[in-house]
């Protein structure tokens, strides 16, 4: 007869399913474990299998596997089964690990907008991740949104004032902007007229403004219209004419003290402060001390046409005077060009016709430089005259400078050379600086002549070209006559000679660097080698001197010829040095051989 057992499954430490089985009491506890696993799998096919760890009685005592079931558990007794879940096997042999938490789902899932779908593999109802959002009207906990509409008073309840929003601009465009601006400006003007009369205890101004006051200040409202946000009229922008108002000139500035009413930014307030009537009067009085930036800004102002013609005429005349002052202030003056002569570089001055050939030779041999200084503090009168060099009419400048020089020369106070030397433009000076001193008549001369045509008169250019041609012809004649060379201390202005004789030091450097020996071009390498070998044989073989007398005479003739053609001494030639090294090496080898023989 089989006994009835009530099984309570504890899987992974949690209470699980409960079921009953009929079991043979003569069987062991180990067989009971196998029976429980098979029954659990048959009852719950969609859940993970269990592996029984231990079986206990009602008092939670552990029971060994060797005991019989009838001895421990009577009929209808409670059996506690401790187990852990094992993964399921798929058809392909792979394991699936299930947990009970992932399988559980609410019964009212459809009411909570969860759609359950049937799994294709094992039929488990899984929760679909797609959820439809409920309508906002059905949400009872919907919070009321705050109203961000700007209020006239920032301290009124139920509204949030945001001073940094776009609507706080002074010239914002909206459907009700005109009415709102009229209201707020009327409040501000009312506050100016009676700052304490209509103010309440909490700081809110009374809004009872009459229509007449708004009409009186219509000019102030029209200047703030968004159609013309950047153009202002000096005469009408601050014209607030009110018979009952005794406010001073700073009344428009007091309207800016409340940004919550006029909603004007710091940049607009700064502009109104800088362009107030008092500031404009002060600016016209101190126009000489204002920097360039303020002058530019004052000339850029564009006045708007107004019905008052007198004010328009005054503004136009003041703008014209401001422009003239700015042009005089920003006039660019060219630096004064002063040409002086010192004794270090060739002079760029043109010699006169009365100079003789001796004076021409002296000017060619001597050296002078042209120093250009742009400091107007040395002589203000002459520098003012010289600053006009860049003007279009340069002939008048030449006449002025020549007359100035003649006047100073009569008084004995002349500090500058004659006008023929002074009237040299920067182009001719740069050309003269780049021109080599020893090549007169080259291409640079023609370039400098062409450049100087714009500033030097034509007569002076003709004289200059004639003198240069005469000087060049004289230098060529002197070169053909073979005149003695001038000393090296003075820089020579003659043409370089085509055939130059190099010095001894230069030849020695060339011989050490490039060629082993400088010899006559007619001698070939083979003849030079044969001559050197014959010379060595003549020196070494003294016994055969009588037999080779003819060859030695030829050798001496060749050596004398070579010595005449080569200015380097024999002892300093590269071939002689190499031969001496070879001889020393041979002697050393012979000495070593002798020592080896002795040993």
From Swiss-Prot:
<feature type="compositionally biased region" description="Polar residues">
    <location>
        <begin position="421"/>
        <end position="431"/>
    </location>
</feature>
<protein>
    <recommendedName>
        <fullName>Nucleolar protein dnt1</fullName>
    </recommendedName>
</protein>
<feature type="compositionally biased region" description="Polar residues">
    <location>
        <begin position="390"/>
        <end position="401"/>
    </location>
</feature>
<feature type="compositionally biased region" description="Basic and acidic residues">
    <location>
        <begin position="558"/>
        <end position="574"/>
    </location>
</feature>
<feature type="modified residue" description="Phosphoserine">
    <location>
        <position position="306"/>
    </location>
</feature>
<feature type="compositionally biased region" description="Polar residues">
    <location>
        <begin position="501"/>
        <end position="514"/>
    </location>
</feature>
<dbReference type="GO" id="GO:1902426">
    <property type="term" value="P:deactivation of mitotic spindle assembly checkpoint"/>
</dbReference>
<feature type="compositionally biased region" description="Basic and acidic residues">
    <location>
        <begin position="483"/>
        <end position="500"/>
    </location>
</feature>
<feature type="compositionally biased region" description="Polar residues">
    <location>
        <begin position="218"/>
        <end position="241"/>
    </location>
</feature>
<feature type="compositionally biased region" description="Basic and acidic residues">
    <location>
        <begin position="292"/>
        <end position="303"/>
    </location>
</feature>
<feature type="compositionally biased region" description="Acidic residues">
    <location>
        <begin position="307"/>
        <end position="320"/>
    </location>
</feature>
<dbReference type="GO" id="GO:0072686">
    <property type="term" value="C:mitotic spindle"/>
</dbReference>
<feature type="compositionally biased region" description="Basic and acidic residues">
    <location>
        <begin position="321"/>
        <end position="333"/>
    </location>
</feature>
<dbReference type="GO" id="GO:0005737">
    <property type="term" value="C:cytoplasm"/>
</dbReference>
<comment type="function">
    <text>Negatively regulates the septation initiation network (SIN) pathway, independently of the cdc14 phosphatase clp1. May also have a role in silencing rDNA transcription. Required for maintaining the exclusive nucleolus localization of nuc1.</text>
</comment>
<keyword id="KW-0206">Cytoskeleton</keyword>
<keyword id="KW-0132">Cell division</keyword>
<keyword id="KW-0539">Nucleus</keyword>
<feature type="modified residue" description="Phosphothreonine">
    <location>
        <position position="513"/>
    </location>
</feature>
<dbReference type="GO" id="GO:1902543">
    <property type="term" value="P:negative regulation of protein localization to mitotic spindle pole body"/>
</dbReference>
<dbReference type="InterPro" id="IPR018844">
    <property type="entry name" value="Dnt1-like_N"/>
</dbReference>
<feature type="compositionally biased region" description="Basic and acidic residues">
    <location>
        <begin position="533"/>
        <end position="542"/>
    </location>
</feature>
<keyword id="KW-0597">Phosphoprotein</keyword>
<dbReference type="GO" id="GO:0005730">
    <property type="term" value="C:nucleolus"/>
</dbReference>
<dbReference type="GO" id="GO:0031030">
    <property type="term" value="P:negative regulation of septation initiation signaling"/>
</dbReference>
<keyword id="KW-0131">Cell cycle</keyword>
<feature type="compositionally biased region" description="Polar residues">
    <location>
        <begin position="344"/>
        <end position="354"/>
    </location>
</feature>
<dbReference type="GO" id="GO:0000917">
    <property type="term" value="P:division septum assembly"/>
</dbReference>
<dbReference type="Pfam" id="PF10407">
    <property type="entry name" value="Cytokin_check_N"/>
</dbReference>
<feature type="compositionally biased region" description="Polar residues">
    <location>
        <begin position="456"/>
        <end position="480"/>
    </location>
</feature>
<feature type="compositionally biased region" description="Acidic residues">
    <location>
        <begin position="436"/>
        <end position="452"/>
    </location>
</feature>
<feature type="compositionally biased region" description="Basic and acidic residues">
    <location>
        <begin position="402"/>
        <end position="413"/>
    </location>
</feature>
<feature type="compositionally biased region" description="Low complexity">
    <location>
        <begin position="364"/>
        <end position="380"/>
    </location>
</feature>
<feature type="region of interest" description="Disordered">
    <location>
        <begin position="292"/>
        <end position="599"/>
    </location>
</feature>
<keyword id="KW-0717">Septation</keyword>
<feature type="region of interest" description="Disordered">
    <location>
        <begin position="210"/>
        <end position="262"/>
    </location>
</feature>
<feature type="compositionally biased region" description="Low complexity">
    <location>
        <begin position="242"/>
        <end position="251"/>
    </location>
</feature>
<dbReference type="GO" id="GO:0010971">
    <property type="term" value="P:positive regulation of G2/M transition of mitotic cell cycle"/>
</dbReference>
<keyword id="KW-0498">Mitosis</keyword>
<keyword id="KW-0963">Cytoplasm</keyword>
<feature type="modified residue" description="Phosphoserine">
    <location>
        <position position="174"/>
    </location>
</feature>
């Amino acid at each position: 007869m089989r006994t009835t057992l009530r099984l309570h499954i504890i899987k992974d430490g949690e209470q699980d399913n409960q079921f009953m089985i009929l079991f043979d009491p003569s069987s062991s506890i180990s067989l009971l474990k196998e029976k429980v696993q098979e029954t659990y799998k048959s009852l719950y096919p969609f859940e993970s299998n269990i592996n029984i760890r231990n079986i206990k009685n009602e008092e939670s005592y552990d029971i060994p596997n060797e005991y019989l079931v009838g001895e421990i558990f009577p009929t209808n007794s409670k059996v506690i089964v401790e187990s852990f879940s094992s993964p399921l096997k798929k058809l392909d042999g792979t394991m699936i690990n299930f947990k009970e938490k992932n399988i559980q789902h609410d019964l009212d899932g459809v009411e909570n907008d969860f759609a359950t779908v049937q799994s294709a593999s094992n039929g488990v109802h899984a929760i679909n991740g797609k959820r439809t959002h409920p309508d906002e009207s059905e949400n009872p906990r919907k919070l009321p949104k705050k109203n961000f509409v700007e209020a006239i008073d920032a301290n009124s309840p139920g509204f949030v004032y945001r001073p940094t929003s776009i609507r706080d601009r002074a010239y914002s465009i909206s459907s009700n902007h005109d009415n709102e601006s009229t209201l707020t400006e009327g409040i501000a003007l009312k506050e100016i007229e009676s700052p304490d009369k209509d103010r309440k205890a909490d700081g809110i101004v009374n809004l009872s403004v009459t229509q007449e006051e708004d009409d009186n200040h219509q000019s102030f409202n029209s200047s703030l219209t968004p159609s013309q946000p950047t153009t202002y009229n000096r005469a009408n922008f601050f014209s607030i004419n009110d018979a009952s108002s005794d406010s001073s000139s700073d009344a428009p500035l007091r309207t800016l003290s409340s940004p919550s009413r006029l909603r004007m930014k710091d940049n607009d307030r700064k502009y109104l402060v800088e362009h107030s009537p008092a500031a404009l009067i002060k600016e016209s009085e101190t126009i000489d001390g204002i920097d360039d930036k303020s002058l530019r800004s004052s000339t850029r102002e564009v006045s708007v046409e107004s019905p008052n013609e007198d004010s328009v005429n005054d503004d136009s005349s003041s703008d014209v005077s401001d422009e003239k002052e700015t042009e005089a202030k920003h006039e660019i003056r060219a630096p004064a060009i002063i040409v002086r002569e010192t004794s270090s570089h060739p002079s760029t001055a043109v010699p006169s016709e009365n100079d003789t050939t001796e004076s021409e030779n002296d000017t060619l041999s001597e050296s002078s430089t042209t120093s250009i200084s742009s400091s107007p503090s040395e002589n203000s009168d002459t520098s003012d005259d010289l600053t006009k060099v860049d003007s279009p009419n340069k002939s008048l400048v030449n006449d002025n400078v020549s007359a100035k020089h003649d006047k100073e020369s009569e008084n004995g106070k002349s500090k500058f050379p004659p006008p023929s030397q002074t009237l040299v433009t920067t182009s001719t000076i740069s050309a003269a600086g780049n021109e080599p001193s020893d090549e007169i008549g080259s291409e640079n001369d023609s370039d400098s002549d062409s450049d100087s045509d714009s500033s030097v008169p034509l007569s002076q250019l003709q004289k200059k070209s004639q003198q240069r041609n005469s000087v060049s012809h004289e230098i060529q004649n002197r070169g053909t006559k073979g005149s003695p060379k001038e000393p090296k201390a003075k820089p020579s202005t003659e043409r370089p000679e085509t055939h130059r004789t190099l010095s001894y030091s230069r030849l020695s450097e060339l011989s050490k660097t490039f060629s082993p020996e400088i010899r006559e071009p007619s001698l070939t390498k083979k003849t030079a080698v044969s001559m050197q070998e014959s010379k060595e044989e003549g020196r070494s073989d003294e016994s055969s001197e009588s037999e080779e007398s003819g060859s030695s005479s030829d050798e001496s003739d060749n050596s004398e010829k070579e010595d005449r053609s080569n200015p380097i001494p024999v002892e300093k030639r590269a071939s002689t040095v190499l031969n001496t090294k070879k001889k020393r090496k041979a002697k050393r080898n012979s000495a070593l051989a002798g020592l080896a023989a002795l040993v």
